[in-house]
């Protein structure tokens, strides 16, 4: 086919809906501003919390509740050393406490907090709460809820936690309508994808702060600090979002490339899920810009480009040179020039940091995702249907998560994202393969009907259905089991001893948490529903009163 003969009617257009935000984020007009006196108050509150945490060291349950509240309220990053010390103290007492106390709430809370911190404490502590083969003794609702939360830390082979998950979920669903607030809200959130382990930290904090306030026994200094800190970070995030929105608007990509998804706000929200803390501002900026590129690539390969054009673009990415520009169709020249410009900006940051080596890994990350997109385009062109194993090898690359994880390291501090960290991710260890499978399957499980509206390659659901001669419902159920298996593998890989420090591993864990939001019931990046809009508004528009 001559490139000049390619018409709009021959392109597999997806007709994505436009940006839902208009110019809402074009100007930074913070509803909350922190005065010098409030910054001083933050420091005073931090000192008060430190004192309280230290005083609680001799009271097991009190210390547990303090650590849990700090984490759930979203201020753990302010007390990393203190929490490390507190959890070491709790670990030393864990076995004896669980042996001497028949307290489901404290046992489950201890187990979850210690597992979250990487300590491989035994799940046998729950055996004494069993009631029959699959049942558990029902205690107060908070104890059952905490056991439900603890089950999200399970790994392969922990049958007691598999049984506890089913039991506690069913029990909480059965009594939810009879509960009153604030416990009703907490149960609702846990049952609807916002568990402590799998929820995005910023969403969790935003949801938990008002719940915590409703409990009469809340710690006043903690609550005040959590509100102040949330609003301060919200103002910072909105300022970052405004700068990125202006960058995106000035590029005029949705006008120049009208077939793409215009999702700058959703992209920023996605990447803030990787890291929300102030020290990761540069890393967020880089990741958002690269994910904007990846989104354009995805739409070009999936919903616009003719196969010969896509082959030219892949070759140009492989060669990575300005000399490739004239060989591309006009619309692809726009994309390729943007790639070079974004990477030139990244290079300038890396030179200042003395980490120029990271640029090679970032380029490699782009080549990986383009390779995945191209292989899928080739299958589509040849009307080839791969087997499940072959599909997953390619589709885990085209899910773009390996690319995003690699790029998430690029703007981090020098002593954290070492060459060894990049090489480790590229070697695809257990936690990476599990994360990539989770990303691919989560996407496929919610995107199948939309994809059927145009020429597409079969998804994991259809391939599994065909290979195993089962119904669509059975295939979906089995693939959901696969996503649970992936979470177990992620949990196991995060238990000590670990290969790399927490800041590296947290990027991978957080990348998985983002999937729980974007691929819950539908593909919320493609179809931005009201629930996602409300979440984004709570995080970037409305401060906590």
UniProtKB/Swiss-Prot annotation:
GO terms under biological process: diterpenoid biosynthetic process; farnesyl diphosphate metabolic process; sesquiterpene biosynthetic process
Task: State which Enzyme Commission number(s) the record gives.
Answer: 4.2.3.75
Record's subcellular location: Cytoplasm, Cytosol
Residues annotated for Mg(2+) 3 binding in this entry: 443, 451
Q: Which Gene3D superfamilies match?
A: Farnesyl Diphosphate Synthase, Terpene synthase, N-terminal domain
Q: Which residues bind Mg(2+) 2?
A: 298, 302
Entries under CDD domains matching the protein: Terpene_cyclase_plant_C1
The answer to whether the entry has keyword Ligase is no
Task: Report the cofactors.
Answer: Mg(2+)
GO molecular function per UniProt: germacrene-D synthase activity; magnesium ion binding; sesquiterpene synthase activity
Q: How is the cofactor bound?
A: Binds 3 Mg(2+) ions per subunit.
**Catalytic reaction(s) noted:** (2E,6E)-farnesyl diphosphate = (-)-germacrene D + diphosphate
Family named by the database record: Belongs to the terpene synthase family.
Q: What does this protein do?
A: Sesquiterpene synthase involved in germacrene D biosynthesis. Also produces at least 13 additional sesquiterpene products, including germacrene C and (+)-germacrene A, beta-ylangene, (E)-beta-farnesene and (E,E)-alpha-farnesene.
Q: What is known of its domains?
A: The Asp-Asp-Xaa-Xaa-Asp/Glu (DDXXD/E) motif is important for the catalytic activity, presumably through binding to Mg(2+).
Name of the protein in question: Germacrene D synthase 1
Give the lineage. Answer: Eukaryota, Viridiplantae, Streptophyta, Embryophyta, Tracheophyta
């Amino acid at each position: 086919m001559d490139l000049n003969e390619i018409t709009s009617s021959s392109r597999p257009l997806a007709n994505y809906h436009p940006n839902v935000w208009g110019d809402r984020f074009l100007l930074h007009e913070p509803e909350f501003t922190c005065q010098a006196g409030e910054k001083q108050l933050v420091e005073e509150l931090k000192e008060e919390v430190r004192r309280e945490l230290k005083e609680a060291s001799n009271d097991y349950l009190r210390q547990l509740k303090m650590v849990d509240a700090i984490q759930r309220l979203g201020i753990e990053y302010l007390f990393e050393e203190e929490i490390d010390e507190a959890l070491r103290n709790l670990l030393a007492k864990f076995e004896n406490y669980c042996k001497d106390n028949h307290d489901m709430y404290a046992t489950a809370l201890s187990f979850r907090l210690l597992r979250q911190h990487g300590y491989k404490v035994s799940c046998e502590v729950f055996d004494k709460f069993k009631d029959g083969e699959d049942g558990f003794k029902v205690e107060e609702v908070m104890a059952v809820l905490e056991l439900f939360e603890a089950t999200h830390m399970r790994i392969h082979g922990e049958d007691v936690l598999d049984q506890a998950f089913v039991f506690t979920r069913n029990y909480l669903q059965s009594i939810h309508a009879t509960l009153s607030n604030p416990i009703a809200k907490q149960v609702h959130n846990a049952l609807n994808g916002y568990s402590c382990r799998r929820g995005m930290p910023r969403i969790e904090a935003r949801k938990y702060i008002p719940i915590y306030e409703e409990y009469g026994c809340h710690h006043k200094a903690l609550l005040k600090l959590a509100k102040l800190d949330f609003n301060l970070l919200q103002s910072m995030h909105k300022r970052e979002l405004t700068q990125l929105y202006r960058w995106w608007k000035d590029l005029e990509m949705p006008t120049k490339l009208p077939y793409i998804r215009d999702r700058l706000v959703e992209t920023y929200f996605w990447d803030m899920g990787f890291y929300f803390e102030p020290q990761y501002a540069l890393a967020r900026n880089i990741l958002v810009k690269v994910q904007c590129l990846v989104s354009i690539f995805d739409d070009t390969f999936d919903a616009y480009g003719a196969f010969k054009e896509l082959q030219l673009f892949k070759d140009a990415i492989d060669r990575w040179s300005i000399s490739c520009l004239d060989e591309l169709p006009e619309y692809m020249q726009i994309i390729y020039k943007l790639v070079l410009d974004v990477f030139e900006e990244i290079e300038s940051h890396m030179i200042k940091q003395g980490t120029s080596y990271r640029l090679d890994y970032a380029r490699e990350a782009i080549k990986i995702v383009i390779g995945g997109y191209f292989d899928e385009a080739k299958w589509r062109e040849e009307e080839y249907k791969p087997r499940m194993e072959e599909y997953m090898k390619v589709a885990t690359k085209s899910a773009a998560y390996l690319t995003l994880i690699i790029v998430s390291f690029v703007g981090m501090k020098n002593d954290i994202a070492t060459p060894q960290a990049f090489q480790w991710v590229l070697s695809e260890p257990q936690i990476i393969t599990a994360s990539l499978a989770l990303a691919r399957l989560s996407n496929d499980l919610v995107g199948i009907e939309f994809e059927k509206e145009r020429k597409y390659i079969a998804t994991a659901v259809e391939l599994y259905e065909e290979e195993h001669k089962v119904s669509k419902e059975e295939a979906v159920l089995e693939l959901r089991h696969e996503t649970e298996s992936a979470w177990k593998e992620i949990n196991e890989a995060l238990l000590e001893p670990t290969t790399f420090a927490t800041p590296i591993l947290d990027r991978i864990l957080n990348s998985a948490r983002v999937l729980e939001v974007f691929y819950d019931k539908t593909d919320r990046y493609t179809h931005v529903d009201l629930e996602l809009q409300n979440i984004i508004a709570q995080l970037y528009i409305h401060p906590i009163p």
